[in-house]
Amino acid sequence: MEYFNVGKIVNTQGLQGEMRVLSVTDFVEERFKKGQVLALFDEKNQFVMDIEIASHRKQKNFDIIKFKGMYHINDIEKYKGFTLKVAEDQLSDLKDGEFYYHEIIGLGVYEGEELIGKIKEILQPGANDVWVVERHGKRDLLLPYIPPVVLEVDLSNQRVQVELMEGLDDED
C-alpha cells in the first residue's frame, strides 16, 4: 500500500499528550478530524503503527493533535520527529481542477513548448497556493496557482502549461 505525507511531529504541546505537527497536507480538516486513522512512520521511514486522531486544533503555524489512547506527555514524547501519513485508499475523489499535492509535485512546467522546470514544493502563504518551480541554473520560480498563470494541469502527461505574467520571473 502507498502512503502520502500529511505532517511531521515537531514537538510535544503541554503535558496532556498533545503534539505540535507541521502540516504538509492540502486537506487539513479532513486529515486531522476526530476519528481519522493515520499511519505513523519513524525517522527511517519505517511503519510504526496506525493511530486514531482524538482531537485537533490550529495554533499559529501548527496543528495541535492528540492521539486516541495517549493522554500524557510520556506517551508521545518518543514520537517527536516521526511522520504522519495517509493511506492511498483513504484519499477522497476530488472535483475537476482540484489536485492532491503528491500529484502536482514533480510535474514539468512549460510556457509554450519550453520547459521552465519542475514543481518541487507547494507553499500556502495565503489565499492561493504557490508552486515552487526548480529551474536548471536559475533561482527557483514562485508560481501562484491562479487562472491567468496556470493554464492547464495535465496529470496524464506530467505537464503544467503556464503563461508567466510580467514581473513573475525576475531573472528574465
From Swiss-Prot:
GO cellular component, alphabetical, reads: cytoplasm; ribosome
Q: What keywords would UniProt list here?
A: Chaperone, Cytoplasm, Ribosome biogenesis, rRNA processing
Q: InterPro entries from the xrefs? A: PRC-brl_dom, PRC_barrel-like_sf, RimM, RimM_N, RimM_N_sf, Transl_B-barrel_sf
Q: In terms of domain of life, where is this protein from? A: Bacteria
Q: What is its main location?
A: cytoplasm
Q: Which Gene3D superfamilies match?
A: PRC-barrel domain (2.30.30.240), RimM (2.40.30.60)
Q: One matching Pfam family, short form? A: RimM
| Assembly description | Binds ribosomal protein uS19.
Copy the domain comment. Answer: The PRC barrel domain binds ribosomal protein uS19.
Family per similarity comment: Belongs to the RimM family.
The name under which this protein is listed is Ribosome maturation factor RimM
